[in-house]
Amino acid sequence: MKQALRVAFGFLILWASVLHAEVRIVIDSGVDSGRPIGVVPFQWAGPGAAPEDIGGIVAADLRNSGKFNPLDRARLPQQPGSAQEVQPAAWSALGIDAVVVGQVTPNPDGSYNVAYQLVDTGGAPGTVLAQNSYKVNKQWLRYAGHTASDEVFEKLTGIKGAFRTRIAYVVQTNGGQFPYELRVSDYDGYNQFVVHRSPHPLMSPAWSPDGSKLAYVTFESGRSALVIQTLANGAVRQVASFPRHNGAPAFSPDGSKLAFALSKTGSLNLYVMDLASGQIRQVTDGRSNNTEPTWFPDSQNLAFTSDLAGRPQVYKVNINGGAPQRITWEGSQNQDADVSSDGKFMVMVSSNGGQQHIAKQDLATGGVQVLSSTFLDETPSLAPNGTMVIYSSSQGMGSVLNLVSTDGRFKARLPATDGQVKFPAWSPYL
């Protein structure tokens, strides 16, 4: 927890720009088919009301993953304050085999102790499966809740939790001198802050694999340019500003390279920069348009969008040479892919029958599953553990962010109150 807090501390420098008009998760479709679990409100050991609903944060995180269906608080058979008070039979009668309980205690120095216990109410009734405690200041209470969620999630699924991650996105606000803003928030929309404001459009933010930098497209020089901004100090490095289009940046998983699309020779083509030396090499060529690169885990292969066959489809190419290979065959067109960190699947924008939705493709079998049901879906970005996707869609006259689990069980919106929201990018583990 202490190391995780040190990593996250760099963001505090930017929190002077925290906004009041934040995005928040609004549930559209529940997870009745998820694993039932009990999450009890954490016991508050101080005066008045608790400063944060940690139990609510844990329940929301588990629900958002699509893998769990936390029991509504009104249906909880009991509200134990500790593992010893859990009555396994009361929970197992409701089909629940695991319960999360916890405690929040104020300290004289103004900090708080947050503790949780994950209790087995099925196979080995009363056994504590996982537990931990954290000492945090008030502004880190939500982070402590997400930490508990990560640990509970991993214990029960074997998958590393991704609830302490963040998302970057672009907001086009309703007027003002700087109507375009690149913002970052917790994955669930809380603790939002501004990274960069501009009078000109901002596009396509992409995280470095260590979470310390964002690459994005800006038009402040009068034409498109690719820049990399360090979040801790705001330092900006210009990467590319060639004639015509400069766009679609993507850091390699090993952090050594940046892929992007340029049209300096006419058609859009893919290029890769070695970030240490600044040297750029061309990966694709020809008259077709090639863009929207995303890396495979080996940092040697890219998936990308090309109109080589007429309509946009997703292809794979090795950055060291070789002919591109088409990897999407279902639907009239497929584009803007994001490959999972294990390389087993990708999500993409898939169009068929006049509909444009987010779909998931198994890269071994080629099987495709449509995940979303919103309108004109765009720019999907995977959580680092591959369980959730953030994307933008059209709603009314604007754009909003949406969340869908990669098993399709859970769907939610993250509506903003002060503008259109586009180009979401999910951070790595932080």
Swiss-Prot record:
Keyword Cell cycle: yes
Region forming the signal peptide: 1-21
GO BP field: cell division; protein import
Keyword Chloroplast tagged: no
Compartment(s): Periplasm
GO cellular component: periplasmic space
Top-level taxon in the UniProt lineage: Bacteria
Pfam families found in the cross-reference section: PD40 (PF07676), TolB_N (PF04052)
Keywords from the named record: Cell cycle, Cell division, Periplasm, Signal
Assembly notes: The Tol-Pal system is composed of five core proteins: the inner membrane proteins TolA, TolQ and TolR, the periplasmic protein TolB and the outer membrane protein Pal. They form a network linking the inner and outer membranes and the peptidoglycan layer.
Described function: Part of the Tol-Pal system, which plays a role in outer membrane invagination during cell division and is important for maintaining outer membrane integrity. TolB occupies a key intermediary position in the Tol-Pal system because it communicates directly with both membrane-embedded components, Pal in the outer membrane and TolA in the inner membrane.
HAMAP family (alphabetical): TolB
Family from the record: Belongs to the TolB family.
The name this protein goes by in its record: Tol-Pal system protein TolB
Organism: Shigella flexneri
This protein's encoding gene: tolB
